[in-house]
Amino acid sequence: MTERIGGCNYMKRYGHLYEKIYDMENLKLAHQHAKKGKGWYAEVQMIDSDPDKYLKELQDMLINKTYHTSEYEVFYKNEHGKTRKIYKLPYFPDRVAQWAILQVIEPYLIKHLISDTFSAIPDRGIHKGLSRVKKAVQHDVPNCQYCLKIDARHYYQSVNHDILKQKYRKMFKDNDLLWILDEIIDSINTAEDEDLVSIYLLDEDIDPNTGIPIGNYLSQYSGNYYFSDFDHWMKEVKHVKYYFRYMDDIVILARTKEELHQLLKEINEYFHNNMKLEIKKNYQVFPTYIRGIDYLGYRVFVSYVLLRKQTCKDMKKKMVFFASSFCRKLQNIFVGCCNYIL
């Protein structure tokens, strides 16, 4: 049975999932997934030395509800001219625990997501999103004359904990599952003072329980799911045919710019009233037939697609780095061989 709220259909609420999370086979699989590419981590090697012992320890934490999110390590990463604050949890027990949770709840989250959202979803991603945008632009030219591009200001830092927890409660009725989701969501507030002031109007109480950590595995799915009601509102209430979302990066196509400007006003209201988000001031409304759509690292035109300049530059930098690294390794091997021969 489905529940209809705000013009959008919601699937039935699911229960009896928590015991699947702490099932030993699920924990073993979580460890296998979490350790991919991290075999050199001391924590991974520690668990591999006696997996039954350590995974039983995690299982007991989950059964007895003594699990608490560990302290985050914070570091900064520069990407495309932006400095991002990254939050990192210990491999054990936290990252294994988050994998165990997501292996169980991921299918239910994906069921509620529309087909035109592409971030943090298996078998979708950038190329699937690009293909959908390209198909719209090239096969329905009259209804794709104009594009609205928006994204949320400081998105991860602006996610409201209470709203996110209520969204999970619309889907799950398992109190034990909701307990551990709440525990992870409330483990840290990542919003800066300027984010809080920007989000909340003067006549509202500022909620300090805001912001989820970039770098948390659960944050990717929570960040995607936070938008799900909005996605359904766009499709089922506003009946927007060409709406595409990659996390908080949104592209909407329409016949006229007037339609898009009106829609932008309504989106602004929805963001503030229902999600406590703010649209970045650099939103764009433009004709697609003149400049193409800059999205997901590409520029999409009616008759062709180009790589974005910055994407090309990034690829060149990586190629130079790997080439120089490979040359250094060859040189070291050559010197080693010469020393051995001599």
Place the predicted regions along the sequence by residue:
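Active-site-proximal segment of RNA-dependent polymerases
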Residues: 3-4, 13-17, 102-160
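A common structural junction motif
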Residues: 268-277
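Amphipathic alpha-helical blocks
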Residues: 47-71
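Right-hand nucleic-acid polymerase module
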Residues: 2, 99, 201-209, 261, ...
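Non-catalytic, polymerase-adjacent accessory regions of viral genome-replication enzymes
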Residues: 1-56
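Conserved polymerase palm-domain catalytic core
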Residues: 61-62, 136-247, 251-266, 287
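Short, conserved non-catalytic motifs in the polymerase core
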Residues: 3, 38-45, 70-96, 112-124, ...
